[in-house]
Amino acid sequence: MANTVSAKKMTRKIAKRTAINRSRRSRMRTFVRKVEEAIATGDQGQALAALRVAEPEIMRAAQHGIVHKNNASRKVSRLAARVKAIAA
């Protein structure tokens, strides 16, 4: 248990930051899931539209430190490859 005023404040700040990070991570995962569901249906147009919406969300999560920049780039790249493979 925090005893000092500064430690109590840090506990509050950490709780607030954790809630924000959890929300952002959840939002990113939701957009990724929408792309994956569109890929599963086999509709390339719908999958491409979902990817165009998801890509900025994934990169925004990286910008805020939710995931590493390389991790975000890899996610986008792999999703794009899967969307592209639908046509083949």
Curated annotation (Swiss-Prot):
Among Pfam families, the record links this protein to: Ribosomal_S20p
The molecular function GO annotations come to: small ribosomal subunit rRNA binding; structural constituent of ribosome
Q: Which SUPFAM superfamilies match?
A: Ribosomal protein S20
Keyword Transferase among UniProt keywords? no
Q: What keywords are assigned to this protein?
A: Ribonucleoprotein, Ribosomal protein, RNA-binding, rRNA-binding
* InterPro entries in the cross-refs: Ribosomal_bS20, Ribosomal_bS20_sf
Note the superkingdom of the native organism: Bacteria
GO cellular component terms, A-Z: cytosol; small ribosomal subunit
Biological process GO annotation list?
A: translation
By its UniProt entry, which Gene3D superfamilies does this protein fall under?
A: Ribosomal protein S20
Give the record's family classification: Belongs to the bacterial ribosomal protein bS20 family.
Annotated function: Binds directly to 16S ribosomal RNA.
User: What protein name does the entry list?
Assistant: Small ribosomal subunit protein bS20
